[in-house]
């Protein structure tokens, strides 16, 4: 059994149709797993199901052999699962440090220790700690979002389109930071449209089509799979 997994998840929003159908995903600690696929494939929905943001009609979500399918999103955060949404993931009117402090609101210990660890991972945040986040570049704001999510020292980090809207150079830099986070032992699941680049840093990947598992394998296997390349990588 993997460290964190969603098993045969089926569900949608409210009373609407199912968006994911018998979808299964898993990740180990110290691993990056990418969820890929065309628009409308259910990628973000699968992630949100694992976060408890929609009710599953069937299937389960398990972390460290504990079934958390009935846990609320807040309880899942307390269990060590952190999430960076694609948009509205920082407080633009607050400083870098204030954003990190908000990310650590669940902590009972001295958050300065954790903040300093975040500064070591993301040196630019230390440099700009007193700057208002709304004045930062897109890539720097994403680093703030990552840092804030890491303030609970999660065992699982879920990222929804972390490189959306940034330049190729900034995308490469963000992926380098994500790899650094992985090396601390965090299990990382990310939804990405930049499939080639995501697979190049991923230990494993899943390709979803209409909410179902279509392909899965190591990042290298998926990059080299002719059908995956033709259908999803534009090659």
Place the predicted regions along the sequence by residue.
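Glycine-rich phosphate-binding loops of nucleotide-dependent enzymes
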Residues: 2-235
